[in-house]
Amino acid sequence: MELYLDTSDVAAVKKLARIFPLAGVTTNPSIVAAGKKPLDVLLPELHDALGGKGQLFAQVMATSAEAMVEDARKLRAIINDLVVKVPVTAEGLAAIKILKAEGIPTLGTAVYGAAQGMLSALAGAEYVAPYVNRLDAQGGDGIQTVVELQQLLTLHAPQAKVLAASFKTPRQALNCLLAGCEAITLPLDVAQQFISAPAVDAAVAKFEQDWQSAFGRTSI
């Protein structure tokens, strides 16, 4: 199982990399724009924040297949083992095929349907990213889409992994993992929810109180 953070916040990545068993960091154009750092600055900083060990993802901006391929080459010139995110449009599928032939790994992104995701995997994408909460917000069923996509990949494109994205709650992420997803990417607020547990804090405080009462200290 691969756990990613979906962010451009370098300081947060450095902090959470100490706590979480992170596989890397995903970004998208909106996330990068919010951080106001160009990719040639941001990506090396994220690489360093992960201790030089994690996988990074960044997205093309072009809309034609040929221009997407050029974007991908530029991104790989910044980080040579980067996974290139390509929106799964008709032109995106064509770009994924070309990039596969060039040995450049891709993630099919902006996936709103199981068939769409399967096509990106068949075209050669190593990862497929369904948008769970965005599907729910549009009246769809994000988790069911993930279930169907995972089944399709298991049957017809087992070399590809579902990297589920767009979460508002830890429960959504857990449901994706229960459906068999091999990878998820969490926004910072959801990642924090995973480790924010008032009941656990209360239990630890009670242990300290009892120990202090018995031994006059909180250390062993």
UniProtKB/Swiss-Prot annotation:
Task: Classify the main location.
Answer: cytoplasm
Q: Report any one BP term from Gene Ontology.
A: fructose metabolic process
UniProt keyword annotations, A-Z = Carbohydrate metabolism, Cytoplasm, Lyase, Schiff base
Question: What family does this chain come from, according to its entry?
Answer: Belongs to the transaldolase family. Type 3A subfamily.
Tell me the organism's taxonomic lineage.
Answer: Bacteria, Pseudomonadati, Pseudomonadota, Gammaproteobacteria, Enterobacterales
GO MF, one annotated term: fructose 6-phosphate aldolase activity
Q: What is this protein called?
A: Fructose-6-phosphate aldolase
This protein's gene is called fsa
Could you tell me where this protein is found in the cell? Cytoplasm
- Which residues are named in the active-site annotation? K85
One Pfam family per UniProt: TAL_FSA
Subunit structure, briefly?
Homodecamer.
Disulfide connectivity? none
CC annotations in GO: cytoplasm
Q: Which InterPro entries match?
A: Aldolase_TIM, F6P_aldolase, TAL/FSA, Transaldolase_3B/F6P_aldolase, Transaldolase_AS, TSA/FSA_arc/bac
Q: Which domain of life is it from?
A: Bacteria
- Organism source for this protein? Enterobacter sp. (strain 638)
What functional role does this protein have?
Catalyzes the reversible formation of fructose 6-phosphate from dihydroxyacetone and D-glyceraldehyde 3-phosphate via an aldolization reaction.
Q: What is its EC number?
A: 4.1.2.-
Q: Which reaction does it catalyse?
A: beta-D-fructose 6-phosphate = dihydroxyacetone + D-glyceraldehyde 3-phosphate
